[in-house]
């Protein structure tokens, strides 16, 4: 689950991670008032969307309007908010369609001596969280990892213990931090690692992390993703969910008990099993197609779920065809075939439909489909299915 920057900073503050004062607003007049509340000096107006790269992003109809604006008066704060609110902001992470800005964060400015990067993720290979820091703050970390990976420094830590002092000292030495700033870095990094564990995060990223002129380490950003599977332990965090920032199709799928992620391609996939679903997307790509989604109906899929799955897939305007790839195990092929027939009657298929069935009761399932009036293209294996759906949507 993602949250906005201003929400992340509220949580940071409660966890002892230093942040600057700021106010979330939804109108230009509120932005001007927020600027005055912050003391009437330098402030920053930031678009609040669930995507990074806002500082280099721009509004679709106004390329000069960036997603992060430095302001020096209430009038400038109001103008910046007017240029963002209700507009679509395009960043490196939103895609060309952009995301609508419905709120902005007006934050106090500060004396910046250095800009750094800090991020924490789970290293699945190492089975531990890993703290990553870099001297290249304010730059997309993906770019740093590709062009200058030697400037990213890592320290794994035990979630039951946290980050040790010697690890902080190692990182400070590599970052060139000493004196008062090193003491601030110890408090900051250890607090961030505790925050990551206590809140069941999948990722916590600050870019930029700054050292002020008086040696204090402060978070100028907050990008946080929580583990959805741990939300039962954090009922209060559910209140931070902004449904307007999430794909409607993904919300529908979640409600129906389906695992669905929307992608940018035009070949929709309906598969049972996460591993098989990923393999299906890979082989579509291998044969020249572009998958439109990840969709795992699970082992216990019923007719209602399959019907809703087709409604979701066919509601995508980019969908030019559907590949159904089922390996019958817990979910028998006859069950899926029956669900397909029911779905065709309720939804109607107006795009090519390629079906590959294998596993338990496969012959009976194929017979059911053959005797029905569902217009399908049969495939005998996954390669055959991928080739046929790519050809049908070309």
UniProtKB/Swiss-Prot annotation:
Residues that hold Mg(2+) according to the record: 207, 221
Is-annotated flag, keyword Secreted? no
Q: Name one GO cellular component term.
A: succinate-CoA ligase complex
**Would the keyword Kinase turn up in this protein's UniProt record?**
no
List the catalysed reactions: succinate + ATP + CoA = succinyl-CoA + ADP + phosphate; GTP + succinate + CoA = succinyl-CoA + GDP + phosphate
Which GO MF terms are attached to this record? ATP binding; magnesium ion binding; succinate-CoA ligase (ADP-forming) activity; succinate-CoA ligase (GDP-forming) activity
List the InterPro entries. ATP-grasp, ATP-grasp_succ-CoA_synth-type, ATP_grasp_subdomain_1, Succ-CoA_synthase_bsu_CS, SUCC_ACL_C, Succ_CoA_ligase-like_bsu, Succinyl-CoA_synth-like
Swiss-Prot/TrEMBL cofactor(s)? Mg(2+)
Family the UniProt entry places it in = Belongs to the succinate/malate CoA ligase beta subunit family.
This protein is called Succinate--CoA ligase [ADP-forming] subunit beta
């Amino acid at each position: 689950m993602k949250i906005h920057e201003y929400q992340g900073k509220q949580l940071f503050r409660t966890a002892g991670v230093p942040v600057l004062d700021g106010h979330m607003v939804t109108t230009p007049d509120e932005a001007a008032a927020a600027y005055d509340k912050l003391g009437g000096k330098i402030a920053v107006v930031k678009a609040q969307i669930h995507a990074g790269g806002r500082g280099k992003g721009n509004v679709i109809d106004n390329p000069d309007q960036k997603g992060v604006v430095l302001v020096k008066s209430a009038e400038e704060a109001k103008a910046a908010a007017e240029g963002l609110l209700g507009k679509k902001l395009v960043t490196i992470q939103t895609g060309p369609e952009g995301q609508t800005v419905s709120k902005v964060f007006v934050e106090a400015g500060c004396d910046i001596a250095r800009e750094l990067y800090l991020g924490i993720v789970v290293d699945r290979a190492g089975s531990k969280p890993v703290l990553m820091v870099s001297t290249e703050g304010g730059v997309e970390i993906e770019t740093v990892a590709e062009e200058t990976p030697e400037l990213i420094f890592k320290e794994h830590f035990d979630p039951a213990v946290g980050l040790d002092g010697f690890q902080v000292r190692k990182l400070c030495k590599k970052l060139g931090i000493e004196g008062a700033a090193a003491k601030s870095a110890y408090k900051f990094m250890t607090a961030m690692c505790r925050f990551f564990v206590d809140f069941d995060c999948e990722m916590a990223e600050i870019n930029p992390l700054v050292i002020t002129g008086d040696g204090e380490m402060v978070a100028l950003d907050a990008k946080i993703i929580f583990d959805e599977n741990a939300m039962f332990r954090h009922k209060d965090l559910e209140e931070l969910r902004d449904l307007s920032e999430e794909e409607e199709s993904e919300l529908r799928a979640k409600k129906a008990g389906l695992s669905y992620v929307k992608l940018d391609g035009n070949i929709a996939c309906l598969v049972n099993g996460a591993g098989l679903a990923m393999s299906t997307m890979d082989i579509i790509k291998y044969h020249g197609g572009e998958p439109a989604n990840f969709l795992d109906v699970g082992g216990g899929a019923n007719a209602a779920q399959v019907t809703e799955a087709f409604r979701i897939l066919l509601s995508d305007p980019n969908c030019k065809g559907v590949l159904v790839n089922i390996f019958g195990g817990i979910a028998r092929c006859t069950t899926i075939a029956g669900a397909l027939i029911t779905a065709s009657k309720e939804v109607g298929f107006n795009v090519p439909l390629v079906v590959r069935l294998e596993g338990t009761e496969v012959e009976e399932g194929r017979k059911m489909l053959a005797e029905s009036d569902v217009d399908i293209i049969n495939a005998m294996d996954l390669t055959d299915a991928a080739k046929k759906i790519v050809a049908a949507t070309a």
